[in-house]
UniProtKB/Swiss-Prot annotation:
InterPro entries for this protein: SAGA_su_Sgf11, Sgf11_N
Similarity field: Belongs to the SGF11 family.
Molecular-function GO term, any one: zinc ion binding
Oligomer and partners: Component of the 1.8 MDa SAGA transcription coactivator-HAT complex. SAGA is built of 5 distinct domains with specialized functions. Within the SAGA complex, SUS1, SGF11, SGF73 and UBP8 form an additional subcomplex of SAGA called the DUB module (deubiquitination module). Interacts directly with SGF73, SUS1 and UBP8.
Organism lineage string: Eukaryota, Fungi, Dikarya, Ascomycota, Saccharomycotina
Protein's recorded name: SAGA-associated factor 11
Subcellular compartments: Nucleus
Functional summary from the UniProt entry: Functions as a component of the transcription regulatory histone acetylation (HAT) complex SAGA. At the promoters, SAGA is required for recruitment of the basal transcription machinery. It influences RNA polymerase II transcriptional activity through different activities such as TBP interaction and promoter selectivity, interaction with transcription activators, and chromatin modification through histone acetylation and deubiquitination. SAGA acetylates nucleosomal histone H3 to some extent (to form H3K9ac, H3K14ac, H3K18ac and H3K23ac).
Domain notes: The long N-terminal helix forms part of the 'assembly lobe' of the SAGA deubiquitination module. The C-terminal SGF11-type zinc-finger domain together with the C-terminal catalytic domain of UBP8 forms the 'catalytic lobe' of the SAGA deubiquitination module.
Length: 97
């Protein structure tokens, strides 16, 4: 009627206890974080996930990088959005020479 205690059964029991404690700790921390975020930002909506990759995180169609043009405040030229950083580095370094 008494269960025999072996090294394997004790080790398994300790392992299960530690594993359960770790899982419960992670779940409780995440629950607290989620509740705090919900209190701080009650109207926040989750981001939209599009598996095809054609929509951005707000659920709108992605815009091609080359379609966005930004006017440089230094020289006044229209520069493509994906080249703006490189243009700005060159544009600002021209005055130092």
């Amino acid at each position: 009627m008494t269960a025999s205690l072996t090294t394997d059964s004790v080790a398994d029991s300790i392992y299960q206890n530690i594993l359960t404690s770790i899982i419960q700790d992670i779940i409780s921390r995440q629950t607290v974080k989620r509740k705090l975020l919900k209190l701080q930002f009650p109207d926040a909506k989750p981001y939209y996930a599009d598996p095809s990759g054609t929509l951005d995180i707000h659920g709108k169609a992605k815009q091609a990088d080359s379609a966005v043009y930004i006017e440089c405040n230094v020289c006044g030229r229209e520069v493509s959005g994906n080249r703006f950083a490189a243009h700005l580095v060159r544009c600002l370094s021209r005055g130092r020479r």
